[in-house]
Amino acid sequence: MSLKWTDVLEIAIQLDESKPEVDPRYVNFVDLRRWVVELPEFSDDPQRSGEKVLEAIQAAWIEERD
């Protein structure tokens, strides 16, 4: 499975599994973007991320953690 920026929930799940020590409420977007791009299954253009998609990923990650 290859991940795109639109796969918000799956990205959040993978971040939650790979970064259990991180509290997603306090993640800055620079780190979040880097971690998404570094996911093994991520295959989208790294330059296509924007604030809205990063906010959606962060919100989904917070929800996943709860």
UniProtKB/Swiss-Prot annotation:
Family membership noted in the UniProt record: To E.coli YfhJ.
Pfam families for the chain: Fe-S_assembly
* Gene Ontology biological-process entries: iron-sulfur cluster assembly
Query: Which organism does this record belong to?
Result: Pseudomonas aeruginosa (strain ATCC 15692 / DSM 22644 / CIP 104116 / JCM 14847 / LMG 12228 / 1C / PRS 101 / PAO1)
* Protein origin, superkingdom: Bacteria
Q: Which SUPFAM superfamilies match?
A: IscX-like
Per the record, its GO cellular-component terms are: cytosol
Q: Which Gene Ontology molecular function entries are recorded, alphabetically? A: ferrous iron binding
Q: Tell me the InterPro entries matching this sequence.
A: ISC_FeS_clus_asmbl_IscsX (IPR007479), IscX-like_sf (IPR036762)
This protein's name: Uncharacterized protein PA3808
